[in-house]
Amino acid sequence: EIRLSLVGSEMCIRDRYTSYPTADRFTKEFGAEDFKKVLNARGTGENTADLSLYVHIPFCANVCFFCGCNKEVTKDHCRSKEYLEVLSKECELVSAEIGGNKEVVQLHFGGGSPTFLNNEEIFQVMDIIRSHFALAPDAEISIEVDPRSTPVDKVEVLAKAGFNRMSIGAVSYTHLTLPT
């Protein structure tokens, strides 16, 4: 049942903006060698813009029916273990193309729900990043959190791991709109 009284002034049509570049910009004409050239240009100084990284953690413990993001709904942490192994390899390959002379000034974890990761996995993923990339001392290190499954002790773990910003993508602050 749709309760229009809860929707109110939010009833309007908007573009779905969930990534940059948007999905329609990806083509088969841009292949692996093109990607390597772009990464290499980042490391050789041809592109002097600050380096920012986005890490996608696609796992969610529960489905949110309003979400259009790339996600896998699971409670099985064997899936995240496998994913972190592949993420480590990808970081190794990307950092080899970029080289070690660029500092990361911004690191963002999105998803899915990155706080799906257990405490050990949170530290593991940060170790993976730090082993392949130099984080600037004042880097913004942010993570999207699901407030329904992020207790205070998890926030403390995030801070200890180095996160200094949280993004709470609240759809609503009323339990009537977003039941748990």
Regions from the PLM with identified roles:
Residues 1-8, 13, 175-180:
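Single conserved hydrophobic/aromatic residue that forms the stacking wall/gate
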Residues 8-10, 14-52:
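Flexible, acidic/Gly-rich N-terminal and inter-domain linker regions that tether
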Residues 47-84, 176:
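Canonical Radical SAM [4Fe-4S] cluster-binding loop centered on the CxxxCxxC motif
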Residues 82-86, 149-150:
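Glycine-rich anion/phosphate-binding loops
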Residues 89-107:
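Short Fe-S-cluster ligation motifs
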Residues 101-105, 118-178:
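Radical SAM/AdoMet-radical enzyme domain recognition
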Residues 108-114:
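Glycine-rich beta-strand-to-loop/alpha-helix junction loops that act as flexible
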